[in-house]
Structures are given as C-alpha cells and as structure tokens.
Amino acid sequence: MLPVAGSDVTVWSPQGRIHQIEYAMEAVKQGSATVGLKSKTHAVLVALKRAQSELAAHQKKILYVDNHIGISIAGLTADARLLCNFMRQECLDSRFVFDRPLPVSRLVSLIGSKTQIPTQRYGRRPYGVGLLIAGYDDMGPHIFQTCPSANYFDCKAMSIGARSQSARNYLERHMTEFTDCNLNELVKHGLRALRETLPAEQDLTTKNVSIGIVGKDMEFTIYDDDDVAPFLEGLEERPQRKPALPADEPAEKAEEPMEH
C-alpha cells in the first residue's frame, strides 16, 4: 500500500508539496517571537522569553555560538540546542585548523546543508526550529534567517515566531532608518518591533526580554534580566487603547488613531 502524502517526508503530494516540511514550518510559528536587525556597525537580536508555567524559569532564547556569532530561536528548543552545538563545533574547527574565525555566510551554508538531510531521507523528520543568526566578520554585520525547509536568507531585518507579522510590519516601515542608527537606537527599534507581537495588555519587562549584540570591536554579548533595564528605560510607554467616554462628555481629541 502506498504511503499517504503528508505522512512521510519522502512522499510528495499531488500538488508538488512536502507536507512534513510545512508542518515543521508551523512549529516555528508556535514559538515566541524574536527580532533581528542590523546597522552599518552592529547586528542585534531581541527575543521574547516564555515560561512554561509560573513555577518555571523563563527559557533562554538567545544562544552564544562564538565571539562573533550568536543565534535566537523560535520553535523546538531541543532541535535548536543540537544545531547550536553543531555551529559551535564548526567555529572551533575553523579556529584550530585555519586560525581564524569562521565567516558568517560559510556557517549559515553549513547549517543549510545539515538541515537539508532530514528533508530527503526516510525515517527522519525536519528540524522544527527557525534561527535568526547575528554575526560580524570582515564583510561587516550580518542577519541571516534559516528555515526547517533548509532555506536560508540574508536579511536587513527579520522577525520569526508567534505574531511575528506585526513585528515585520514595523521593521518594513522603519527599515531605511536602521543603516545609520547608533547602537542604542538600533536596540530600541528592535524592542519596539518585538513589542508589536504582544497582546495589548502586556508589555516588555526585564523578565521576558533578552538582547544579543555583536559588532565592530564588540564580541557577541547577551543581556538578560537586570542588564536589559537600561535599554528598556529609554523606551517610550506603549500606547494603550483609550477607554470610551460617557455619552455626555465630548472627546477632547480625535487625532490619534486607535490601536489595532
């Protein structure tokens, strides 16, 4: 009996699709949102941390790979941990064998080759995680996106995870400003984009935000908990939906649009 399309990664559907890969792409959309963006001198990752319950600590969303590279994840954390270990090993090999840091584009190419294997072999499943890779090398700062389909993209700015379309809308509106931003302004743009993914009643705090920065003369550094506070202090308050006024009281201003 022939296997049903969608039950196995080696079986094509009549429409020319591989459903198992598409299901893995959906796993990325279930993960908490993360944002990556770059200027002429720096690349920044900003991620939203989730806690599985009130008794659990917040999960790490930004991982250190090498002095010049870090990643943020959306999707299955276990798969991300495996890929991160692979990336660390490749960076170490480059330093021991060639005595130089591994170029970011080369590392992303290796990740693409590794994640392509389970999309083609029987008995394997695609990695259910998407990565945003921030790095700095001789070519300048980089932001790359990788997908469970083994595709990867060089980006000026990108967001993946749950409700990430709202963040991408913000990034598209302000993309022309990123190139000449100083580091603090670049981080603020990342935080504003990440805040767009939150429900109206929530806001960014030192507990649910993680920031990773790499750039010229700056090794990859992760900021968590209290270290995030200086970046959040300079961020304006999130505009809230105004409560409806009683019928006998006229509205003072109707200039600002309501939040959608």
UniProtKB/Swiss-Prot annotation:
Annotated region (Disordered), positions in chain: 231-260
Pfam families: Proteasome, Proteasome_A_N
Coiled coil: none
Cell location: Cytoplasm; Nucleus
Protein origin, superkingdom: Eukaryota
Statement: the UniProt record of this protein carries the keyword Transport: no
Cellular component terms (Gene Ontology): cytoplasm; nucleus; proteasome core complex; proteasome core complex, alpha-subunit complex
Ranges of Basic and acidic residues composition bias in the record: 250-260
Predominant location category: cytoplasm
GO biological processes: proteasome-mediated ubiquitin-dependent protein catabolic process
The entry's keywords: Cytoplasm, Nucleus, Proteasome
Subunit structure: The 26S proteasome consists of a 20S proteasome core and two 19S regulatory subunits. The 20S proteasome core is a barrel-shaped complex made of 28 subunits that are arranged in four stacked rings. The two outer rings are each formed by seven alpha subunits, and the two inner rings are formed by seven beta subunits. The proteolytic activity is exerted by three beta-subunits PSMB5, PSMB6 and PSMB7.
Role this protein plays: Component of the 20S core proteasome complex involved in the proteolytic degradation of most intracellular proteins. This complex plays numerous essential roles within the cell by associating with different regulatory particles. Associated with two 19S regulatory particles, forms the 26S proteasome and thus participates in the ATP-dependent degradation of ubiquitinated proteins.
Annotated family: Belongs to the peptidase T1A family.
Protein name per its UniProtKB record: Proteasome subunit alpha type-1
